[in-house]
Amino acid sequence: RHWLAIAARLGLADPDFRDADGRSAYAAFLGLRLTQARLGAAREHDRLDVQTRLSRPGPARHLSVHDLLIGPQRIARVELLSTFVGRLRPGDNRSVARVSVPADTTGDKTGDAADDAADNGQSDGDTGLPPLAQRVRALRAGVDLDAEGLLAPPATLRFSFTPCPRNDFNGAGFLYFANFAAVLDRAAWDWWHEAPQQTTAVREIAWFGNLNVGETLHVGLLGVHRDGPGAGHACELRAGDGRLLARALTRRRPASASAPEPQP
């Protein structure tokens, strides 16, 4: 929905984005934020409706907000922030860099310098940024355990996973963004065998890069919730050579607490 919404905004029939030289460009995610999630409220045969809104908070940036509804009740909100990127070397996900898409910049009176300033924390203040952009900036700087209500883990925990090119990479050749979240859940299950009835209440991910086929993804535990890891935790995801690919925060709730909330 995010990519289709961008395509519709740019007047394209499909999300086939191109840079100034006609090469493929991609709306790659900088951040994801899942909030107000009561996923345990969903039942077999329920009809899930998704309401999507798209905005453009800055040059080359697009923010989509998706409300997930069962009837009149919202069971989750998902926010996605993307920027346009392309590969400097064909087939090499390590060579990804930000690019300009002429269809997006037509009539744009702001410059790329504004994007660079936001990336480097040089804006007029966080009050001018969407909440997801603020969280991406915070996670880029690191994880403040005290501010997040987390404690340093009592032991070093690691989890490794080598994605399969037939299942985990998308048609553009990138490790699919949803599979980063799946690996986080695999790691948590491996470490603690959380109760299956627990569901994710909040998840925030900030991305820094992507993997090539054949590389291994390593998850490291940064912090655990004061009420125990089952209540929440923070992780880093790195490539085998140590490259930082993502930081993530996860908070859980028991399935018994997952009744839907009225939509405001």
Annotate each predicted stretch with a short phrase.
Residues 18-20, 76, 84, 181:
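Bulky hydrophobic/aromatic packing residues
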Residues 1, 35-36, 40, 48, ...:
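A generic structural micro-environment signature
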Residues 1-5, 85-183, 187-193:
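Catalytic strand-loop segment that frames the active site of acyl-thioester-processing enzymes
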Residues 1-49, 57, 184, 188, ...:
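Hydrophobic, proline/glycine-rich low-complexity stretches
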Residues 35, 79-83, 162, 206, ...:
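Residues in well-ordered beta-strands of folded domains
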Residues 40-138, 211-213, 223-264:
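HotDog/MaoC-like acyl-thioester-processing domains
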Residues 31-38, 53-54, 204-206, 221-225:
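Short amphipathic beta-strand and strand-loop transition segments with alternating hydrophobic
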Residues 148-238, 242-244:
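Acidic/His-leaning functional-site neighborhoods
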